[in-house]
């Protein structure tokens, strides 16, 4: 009788194990699929970020090159306009505002501090203004 109980327990255990594996395995597969998708999305995000950084770095290089080339073109036009058109007055010359060498080599425009006052008196303190 003991062998019969052992055999019945073994069969019941195998059935319970098979059922548990069937339902438990589905959740495990879902978890593994989600984990794989998460890792794939993280890798894509990292790749996108690297691509974005390289794009902006290349754009900055191109803008610097373009600014340098523009300065060279402007200096060339200013030199050639003054040498080819010497009789043209300074006011009529479109390239009269020649860039200084120090300005041409400077990558940034000079920054002036903002003023915290206006040119003349305004508002109630203004003198000499007509009142209607």
From Swiss-Prot:
Key words, A-Z: Cell cycle, Cell division, Cell inner membrane, Cell membrane, Cell shape, Membrane, Transmembrane, Transmembrane helix
A Gene Ontology biological process term: regulation of cell shape
Pfam family, one: ZapG-like
Protein's UniProt keywords contain Protein biosynthesis: no
Residue intervals passing through the bilayer: 1-21
Region (Disordered), start-end ranges: 95-132
Compartment annotation: Cell inner membrane
Any single Gene Ontology cellular-component annotation: plasma membrane
Membrane topology category: Single-pass membrane protein
Top-level division of the source organism's lineage: Bacteria
Gene null: resulting phenotype: Deletion of the gene results in morphological aberration, such as branched shape, and cell division defects, such as filamentous growth, defects in DNA segregation and generation of chromosome-less cells. It also shows abnormal FtsZ ring formation and aberrant septum development. Deletion causes high sensitivities to various envelope stresses, loss of envelope stability, increased membrane permeability and causes growth defect under normal growth conditions. Loss of the gene results in aberrant cell size driven by the production of excess membrane phospholipids.
Sequence ranges on the Cytoplasmic membrane side: 22-132
InterPro entries: ZapG-like
Subunit structure: Forms homooligomers. Interacts with proteins of the divisome, such as FtsI and FtsQ, and of the elongasome, such as RodZ and RodA. Also interacts several other proteins, including the shape-determining proteins MreC and MreD, the N-acetylglucosaminyl transferase MurG and the lipopolysaccharide assembly protein LapA. It also copurifies with LapB and various proteins involved in LPS biosynthesis/transport and phospholipid biosynthesis.
NCBIfam families membership: PRK11677.1
Family, similarity comment: Belongs to the ZapG family.
Function: Involved in cell division, cell envelope biogenesis and cell shape maintenance. Is a key regulator of cell envelope growth, playing a crucial role in coordinating cell width, elongation and division to maintain cell envelope integrity. Plays an important role in the lipopolysaccharide (LPS) assembly/transport. It may regulate LpxC levels and assist MsbA-mediated LPS transport.
Name of this chain's protein: Z-ring associated protein G
Gene transcribed to yield this protein: zapG
């Amino acid at each position: 009788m003991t062998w019969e109980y052992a055999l019945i327990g073994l069969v019941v255990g195998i059935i319970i194990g098979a059922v548990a594996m069937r339902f438990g395995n589905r959740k495990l597969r879902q978890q593994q699929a989600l984990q794989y998708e998460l890792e794939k999305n993280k890798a894509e995000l990292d790749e996108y970020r690297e691509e974005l950084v390289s794009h902006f770095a290349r754009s900055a290089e191109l803008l610097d090159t373009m600014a340098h080339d523009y300065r060279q073109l402007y200096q060339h036009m200013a030199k050639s306009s003054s040498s080819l058109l010497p009789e043209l007055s300074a006011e009529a010359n479109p390239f009269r505002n020649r860039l200084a060498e120090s300005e041409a080599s400077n990558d940034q425009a000079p920054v002036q501090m903002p003023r915290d006052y206006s040119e003349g008196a305004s508002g109630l303190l203004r003198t000499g203004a007509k009142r209607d």
